[in-house]
Amino acid sequence: MFKCPERVSVKKKEDILDLPNLVEVQIKSYKQFLQIGKLAEERENIGLEEVFREIFPIKSYNEATILEYLSYNLGVPKYSPEECIRRGITYSVTLKVRFRLTDETGIKEEEVYMGTIPIMTDKGTFIINGAERVVVSQVHRSPGINFEQEKHSKGNVLFSFRIIPYRGSWLEAVFDINDLIYIHIDRKKRRRKILAMTFIRALGYSTDADIIEEFFSVEERSLRSEKDFVALVGKVLADNVVDADSSLVYGKAGEKLSTAMLKRILDTGVQSLKIAVGADENHPIIKMLAKDPTDSYEAALKDFYRRLRPGEPATLANARSTIMRLFFDAKRYNLGRVGRYKLNKKLGFPLDDETLSQVTLRKEDVIGALKYLIRLRMGDEKTSIDDIDHLANRRVRSVGELIQNHCRSGLARMEKIVRERMNLFDFSSDTLTPGKIISAKGLVSVLKDFFSRSQLSQFMDQTNPVAELTHKRRLSALGPGGLNRERAGFEVRDVHASHYGRICPIETPEGPNIGLITSLSSFAKINEFGFIETPYRVVRDGIVTDEIEYMTADVEEECVIAQASAELDEYNMFKTPVCWARYKGEAFEADTSTVTHMDVSPKQLVSVVTGLIPFLEHDDANRALMGSNMQRQAVPLLKTEAAIVGTGLEGRAAKDSGAIIVAQEDGVVEYVDSYEIVVAKKNNPTLKDRYQLKKFLRSNSGTCINQTPLCSVGDVVTHGDVLADGPATDKGELALGKNVLVAFMPWYGYNFEDAIIISERLIKQDAYTSIYIEEFELTARDTKLGKEEITRDIPNVSEEVLANLGEDGIVRIGAEVKPGDILVGKITPKSETELAPEERLLRAIFGEKAADVKDASLTVPPGTEGVVMDVKVFSRKDRLSKSDDELVEEAVHLKDLQKEYKSQLAQLKVEHREKLGALLLNEKAPAAIVHRRSADILVQEGAIFDQETIELLERESLVDLLIAPCDMYDVLKDILSSYETAVQRLEVNYKTEAEHIKEGDADLDHGVIRQVKVYVASKRKLQVGDKMAGRHGNKGVVSKIVPEADMPFLANGETVQMILNPLGVPSRMNLGQVLETHLGYAAKTAGIYVKTPVFEGFPESRIWDMMIEQGLPEDGKSYLFDGKTGERFDSKVVVGYIYMLKLSHLIADKIHARSIGPYSLVTQQPLGGKAQMGGQRFGEMEVWALEAYGVAHMLQEILTVKSDDVSGRTRIYESIVKGENLLRSGTPESFNVLIKEMQGLGLDVRPMVVDA
């Protein structure tokens, strides 16, 4: 079996932890959302299940009719992902939901079809209308509580908190300049400003005593004589002091005790007082009690309502229902598990499951938050304000959650419709069933809208496997509920200490989205609350253990974390008493006895793509950013070649991107061709794994996807072995470019400004040749005037032009086409004009058809040429118009299909029986198995499984069996479930194929009779103007292709393949490219591949040693000779091997010329841009240049006949045809537009004709 090449490394020992599955973010999230493969009763209250349980039951307004949700059921995809791409349809499954309706006539249950729901492919993508798309994870502000501070204009620091729910109204409390706390709801500062004390009362704390008891500890102090006055003067009363007989109030709760008041109270005979410990008249609570205009629960409620809804009558019922709706109704206010977790953690409440399930606000939350805010104001050291850019306060919404939120809004729309229909239904004439009142439109349209229009559902970047992988691991702060790129400040975009090991500090786009779109670090995971975690090794008693702990950013704050590169002895103890470590985001030299954790790997800091840059530690961050981004733009080449200098991540990146085919199980290769690999399983050779290879498919970005087998018949393979290479991979490793012999030197000025000089030898060897595939589509429709027809019989077209078309009017495969060639001939009916009688007679005699149809053929657009690689035709079959022969042929096909279906079903049954036998035969039953519906006991507890019992289980459906959870039965459930899924899939495939034989392509759009897709492949060689780059941000444009004989050569006669400008290195500070050059030269000479992982790569000394070992110059510089003159250059030059990439900015796609073309309707000036066949804009500054030279005639024709002088254009055409040399320009159309605009403003502007 073929294995990846072993790479030489200087790393002392391998990482303790392997990288997690790199697309797990996507797959895990969507799996949790749909819970595919779980029985209805096993489903947890998350994802789609949670949404249905939230919205249902729905009751009619009079509560006589109730619609309950029972369970949902997902079908099997009708087509495979590849077939969906081919047909241009969505890869989805049907969603059926079982409801129970209870009304006056009784109880009815029904399964209702709720439309289709897109499902994820194994690679973590969706196929929507035939295009692969990715849903990007969104980083947003976490629900919960945040404490903040801001400086007032008078210099005071004002503290505030904000309770942010997952859904619902924001609650904000702010200190003002007078130390009073005001509550704002939904950030409406002026209109909804409510004193916090009023709000507390409205929550149900009606008396002042209740409120004081909540905020202070209360002590009872004796008052027997005037001696006790000293201890009591200045203290604050915690309760009213009332005369028992006369009910007179001598002291109110919250009042400060004075000597006179104490005397009055002593005279009444009161012997003890309740005192608020720690309260004084300056305490915010005491101040607010004095300021509060209300004194009871009812008054506070009304005041709250009045401020919230000024102008509306404040009744008690209205006020109570408003506050309930705002914060205590789970349908309108939801903190979510995350919000509750964050709030409880901050305020010190318990974090058990029961508490975390309380999603609405509680009174205790508001009191707790106000207490914390007051402690913060008082300067309590145990309190702190929150940093909103810290990753403890930002969380990730992955695919599942984003779609769940959209489903919720769709079902909420449906809820209104259901209520309306329940009310309007006429029970006298018909019986009500769930199917009659449920409309699936709401859910379907919301999902369709999300996948096709949402900012977070993006067309997948498929330029190469790395681009694909990165797209799935991308994090965006934009999108609905996120930030706005115009308003986002510097702080949000900046790298934060908490990003370490979670978000890559390097990989982000240049331009307006910098810092808003980021990438997950290589080891990062997302936990159940949506916070990003990173792994650390646990350190106990100074010993670094192999135990791994995943930590979120807030937990990490409390730990002292050593670097992964800290040196350990053979007992895993630190070699030195002091090492570099991090604590609360700051790096310092820590005593090793205080270290609690250690990094898992130095590369946990960066993302996968950044981790592919060798010698990253020697590159400036700005250039590393460019290097990361440009690797994603590398075009897959015809001949792939792995990098000599890698980082060790290449194999893993290729595997997780899905570009290569990997063995799922151990086995032996039984059959190999370019389309399929068959592996017989090791445990049971009768069972086969079949791997279909992708051949010359078009990717989203027009590059070519092609897989080639690496194994041979008889090879023994183990799980995870590479069976086939894909695009931009070489022997299972990522291979984005070529290893090229470069020299850093100027050469006749051709490499000025980062330009690149390449040898013609690279072109001859097809080193940088790539294949591009263009797709052209044409549809024939049924129009009002008649049917369009795909045919070879096109009016007014010569036979020469039709040479490459087949009899059916479609170009033959293998034909070479160039711009303007016909790919598919099509004629469209023209609207019939009134004909003269003699014309009608002639038409009748000669039967001229050409007059009533027009040519609407598909032609090759400008700038495209290549070979027709594939043609796909989709058409509907009309049942009535089939001939007898066709019907006979159809029957034969159907018979063959049925035979194939039966044989496959029999094979499945045999495999299923074998699996059950292997698990159960002669084993003892750990628990009874009961039939749900009949309640029959199929297997007694303790019984021995025999063949008969196994056959009995084999016939039953998993849904009908009650199986107790245990190890053996869990495996049994998996076997039964996978068998049922396989049978279901086989049945769907059979029905789909049968339907296709009978109906043709029934899923074509309405009105389409036939659809033809033509694929044209073109080979693009490297040419002048193409953009190339290394992995260190060293980019440039090919300026000259030099004959091999003229290139500089080494003393041994070997010519250099590429020349780079040495001035591109010092100012850019990307020295990684120089080290790569030296190490690449040494490794190439030694015939080995090396890996230099980021931050733990080859030291310089080791590179020099390798150079000397291989007999290369120890300074890495060689004397070169000029290929043109044969003379030696004066100075020594750095020569070595660099891995250079060809980027997808090819000159062939950008070069453009126009002779004639379309004009803008309003201004009558030529359109702009290549896509519109536009012209080059000759703008104001260009006009100045011509004016400076005084070229009057050229100026005149540029501003008139070459632009928007409509009559002049026609005249100049005529004069060119006649061979005259005459320019008579008229009025430019833009002048008329100006006049019309002024007239539109009501100005009477008319050009005056003055006689000369």
Curated annotation (Swiss-Prot):
The superkingdom of the source organism is Bacteria
Q: Molecular function terms in GO for this entry? A: DNA binding; DNA-directed RNA polymerase activity; ribonucleoside binding
Q: Quote the InterPro entries the UniProt record gives.
A: DNA-dir_RNA_pol_bsu_external_1, DNA-dir_RNA_pol_su2, DNA-dir_RNAP_su2_dom, DNA-dir_RNAP_su2_hyb_sf, RNA_pol_bsu_bac, RNA_pol_bsu_CS, RNA_pol_bsu_protrusion, RNA_pol_Rpb2_2
Matches recorded under SUPFAM superfamilies: beta and beta-prime subunits of DNA dependent RNA-polymerase
Matches recorded under CDD domains: RNA_pol_B_RPB2 (cd00653)
* Keyword set, alphabetical order: DNA-directed RNA polymerase, Nucleotidyltransferase, Transcription, Transferase
The reactions it catalyses are: RNA(n) + a ribonucleoside 5'-triphosphate = RNA(n+1) + diphosphate
Which residue ranges traverse the bilayer? none
Question: Coiled-coil ranges per the record?
Answer: none
Task: Please give the GO cellular component terms listed in this UniProt entry.
Answer: DNA-directed RNA polymerase complex
Assigned EC number:
2.7.7.6
User: According to the UniProt record, what class of enzyme is this?
Assistant: transferase
Report if keyword Cell wall biogenesis/degradation is assigned.
no
Q: Name one GO biological process term.
A: DNA-templated transcription
Identify the HAMAP family for this entry: RNApol_bact_RpoB (MF_01321)
Q: How does it assemble?
A: The RNAP catalytic core consists of 2 alpha, 1 beta, 1 beta' and 1 omega subunit. When a sigma factor is associated with the core the holoenzyme is formed, which can initiate transcription.
Q: Describe the task this protein carries out.
A: DNA-dependent RNA polymerase catalyzes the transcription of DNA into RNA using the four ribonucleoside triphosphates as substrates.
Return the similarity comment. Belongs to the RNA polymerase beta chain family.
Q: Tell me the PANTHER family matching this sequence.
A: DNA-DIRECTED RNA POLYMERASE I SUBUNIT 2
What is the protein name stated in its UniProt record? Answer: DNA-directed RNA polymerase subunit beta
Tell me what organism the protein belongs to: Chlamydia trachomatis serovar L2 (strain ATCC VR-902B / DSM 19102 / 434/Bu)
Q: Which gene encodes it?
A: rpoB
